[in-house]
Amino acid sequence: MKNRTNYPPLILGSSSVYRCELLQRLQIPFETASPAVDEFALPGEAPGTTALRLAKEKAHAVAKLFPDALIITADQVAALGEIQLGKPLSHENAVQQLRLMRGREVIFHSALCLFNSRTTRLQARVIPCSVKYRELSDSQIEHYLAKEQPYHCAGSAKAEGLGIALIERITGEDPNALIGLPLIALVEMLMEEEVELF
């Protein structure tokens, strides 16, 4: 690995345990920080645009705390046609989302940013991932939610856990995008910042 002095320290701007676990797979040292950003869609905003805007806002929020760092942020918005499916935040909303999605195709728009707060260079991408949900009974939905309680996950499902059982098929360029941190794109961005992984 290159000498650490050649690039700023890495900061993962996320409180997600799963994003942290994904980033650990790259075997590079990093710290975490939780950005304070209000997560909501603007009227008429496309799902990918919402995810990208929020990921950028998170990067700039973390940059205020770390003015000399490579800051990694991400956000994810699920969409069923024109309907945006954010974090349900309650059992009732999660039941409603899963009923709506059963047997249907949902697109997860995973936005990724790498912001160099030393140089103000921002790299950003949205990586879509298509998910076909199984036909689920109301009973299956209730049992799943009782076991996993995915109330802070876009689309009410944790694909990194039992939520994988809700899914019939996943299509996309990076399977990690569904969990919330597209590693393939992140590696490309880190290489642009001259971070050597091996």
From Swiss-Prot:
Annotated active site = D75
**What's an example GO cellular component term for this entry?**
cytoplasm
> In its UniProt record, which GO terms are filed under biological process?
nucleotide metabolic process
Give the primary localization class: cytoplasm
State its Enzyme Commission number(s).
3.6.1.-
Catalytic activity, reaction form = N(7)-methyl-GTP + H2O = N(7)-methyl-GMP + diphosphate + H(+)
Q: Which EC class is this protein assigned?
A: hydrolase
Which superkingdom, per the lineage? Answer: Bacteria
Q: Where is this site: Important for substrate specificity?
A: Y18, Q76, E160
Q: Where is the signal peptide?
A: none
**Which keywords describe this protein according to UniProt?**
Cytoplasm, Hydrolase, Nucleotide metabolism
Q: Which cofactor does it need?
A: a divalent metal cation
For this protein, the record's InterPro entries field holds: ITPase-like_fam (IPR029001), Maf-like (IPR003697)
Where in the cell?
Cytoplasm
Spell out the molecular function terms from Gene Ontology. nucleoside triphosphate diphosphatase activity
Checking NCBIfam families in the record gives: maf (TIGR00172)
Family the entry assigns: Belongs to the Maf family. YceF subfamily.
What's the stated role of this polypeptide? Answer: Nucleoside triphosphate pyrophosphatase that hydrolyzes 7-methyl-GTP (m(7)GTP). May have a dual role in cell division arrest and in preventing the incorporation of modified nucleotides into cellular nucleic acids.
What is this protein called in UniProt?
A: 7-methyl-GTP pyrophosphatase
